[in-house]
Amino acid sequence: MLLSNVHIWNYRLLLDTNIHLDEALTLIVGKNNAGKTSFLSILQRVLSGRKDLDFADYPIQCRSTLYEVLWKVVKGKISIDKAKDLIPKTAIQFDIDYSNEAEDEYLGALSPFIIDLDINNNIARILVEYQSLLSDTIISEITDKISLLKVTNPTAKSKKSSEIIAISNYLSTNFNKIFEISVKAINPSNPSVFQIREVSHLRDVFIFKRISAERGLDELDNHDKKPIGQVMERIFQDGVIPFEENITKKIEKLKAYVEQESIKAQDEINKLLEEIITKMIRFGYPTAEDLQLKATTQILLKDNIIKDTDLAYSISGENETLPSSHNGLGYKNLIKIVFLLQEFAQEIKKNSLSAIPLLFLEEPEAHMHPQLQTVFVKYISEVLEGFTGNKIQILISTHSSYIANSVPFTQIRYFKRLKECVICKNLTDFYNTCQNDEEKQNNLQFLHKYMTISRCDLYFCDKVILVEGAAERLLIPDMIHKCDQAGLFNTKSPTLASQYCSIIEVGGAYAHKFFDFIDFLGIPALILTDIDFVTLHGKNCLKDKAKRTSNATIMKWCRDKLNIPLSTSVKIEDVYKLISDDKLTNGFRHIEFQKEENGYHARSLEEAIMNVNRDLYSISHSDSTFSFDSENQKKTNFSLQLLTDDDYLDYQTPSYIVDGLIWLNNQDKVVYPVTITVKEKNKRKLTLKTIKD
């Protein structure tokens, strides 16, 4: 059985957030403060059985309603029972799929939550709510708080507003009196049918383990706290219990044999450590070239327990050791995670009747080099299954593009923060929409391969710029800086120069393959591409001889915005029409290509720069036939000269790039969906709605 879905209401920014979980690994990605840690926090709170709710976790968006309802109760306008119905509740709902279990198989701790007698239903639904505990006593305390405020602040301009402030002050210190946890078994076929369950029933269903981002790896010399050693102690206590019992029987003779028994204990512990390390080698560490891991321990006679276990490091074939503080933080991080996984595996074995083991690993990439990050996420499920012998559901949150692009789309959940809430986008939905369209299916395959190879950071940016090649990738950051210094971004704060902008080098032949994905993620995107004039037969040419463009992205844009069918070729006049009819923007996307300046229409970035900086390149102002010789001049050298040569540092930026960067700078946060125009056979109309920063 598995946890298939989690729905959260009114917890921090998770106002109405649905998260579908993969049966093996779910990767949670998104920018900072996008709700990833909040998701973990409510899982940990509820599954650990915490009965109260913190005021800081109650959404700001719900507080005004709560204050208003309590004020009406105080004033006698509504009853306490009515108020309980009106107060927004924090809640989380779990859907557990047990369809893979045999009909006669014992469902263990899940049994109390299966209340639907329909044999065709294989979902158990658990609803956990923080119910209102509003009572006469609480209302009396709030009334006293209001009366006290009248004494201390008699000049308040508005009587009601001052009373609302008093209610807010009361709640900030007494919030644990207002809500208490309630657990229900819900009938999925008829949600109005439910049965009350105990919190202990919920705790029995899950074995939940959190490995937080703040794992504490620093080990100062001569410092008492040894974080990895502490985990090892807990593991080895279980691993050598039979040995400890043997010591207990010989307690009277223990002093005489203590040295001998310590050696045996050391052997037992190193056997267990060797088993763990054997599984850890899957992550590429330690190899024969690395310092080898050993465990050191002491037996304290007064406690009769194993104490002060820690790691030591040795060179292969040598007896000399070094302390654990001599290892790097990246490998320490990996080692500690693996030991915590082993500890979790032991918990699972102790609680075999629990239905679902659930591991939440927060930002495992800390201190790891990129290659180790990739290997880690590739093998974690296999390693953990090796520890337990069972499949474990794993949730990983990350800010690493190496980890994010190492798993298939179907395992990724994208947390996107809007102005007042967080939404979770299930990339399985994007994957599924591509399956019935051959072109989209090909684009999907390209996307995954490209993002894996390039370690694209689309999931973690505010905005994205798709560019032609290396020259644009090198120059765009400098051009953004120039526009910012010129005051062209002053309509926004922070400006584009301070926003998290990803630059993806993809080229005009492939940029259009990103369109559907960008639309799905809802990221403002600027496409900077080349107009690529060609004759009717596809030969490169100047504007006066151009009949069409060879740029696949521009052709796709024309078909979508001008509704040109695939059976009709895109003419160069159609490309010009995009500019004249203001059709360069489509939903979240905006495209820019070269425009005519100084009586010349450039065909590439290099030509556009040369055109607006003619004096730098000794080009006559009347010359309308010059071109960039890509055969004799390397594009990267052209760009580096602009960035490093003192004579070129004050170059001017072409207008099409300036216009595009200003558009991108001015984009606000948006609520998905927006109106996106596509060619007629796939045309869809959606409601445009924006949220201002």
Feature names for model-found ranges:
Residues 48-81, 345-354, 386-395, 420-426, ...:
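Flexible phosphate/Mg2+-sensing switch loops adjacent to catalytic phosphate-binding sites
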Residues 1-48, 312-454, 658-693:
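Switch/communication elements of ASCE P-loop NTPase nucleotide-binding domains
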Residues 73-80, 109-114, 184-201, 278, ...:
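Short alpha-helical segments and helix-capping/turn motifs at coil-helix boundaries
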Residues 200, 447-466, 470-693:
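Acidic, Mg2+-coordinating catalytic modules of nucleic-acid enzymes
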Residues 205, 209, 213, 217-361:
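Extended helical coiled-coil dimerization/tether regions that scaffold
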Residues 57-248, 542-582:
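Glycine-rich phosphate-binding loops of NTPases
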Residues 45, 98-101, 131-136, 215-218, ...:
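Conserved nucleotide-binding/hydrolysis micro-motifs of P-loop NTPases
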Residues 88-90, 121-126, 204-208, 355-356, ...:
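Short glycine-/polar-rich loops that comprise or flank the Walker A/P-loop
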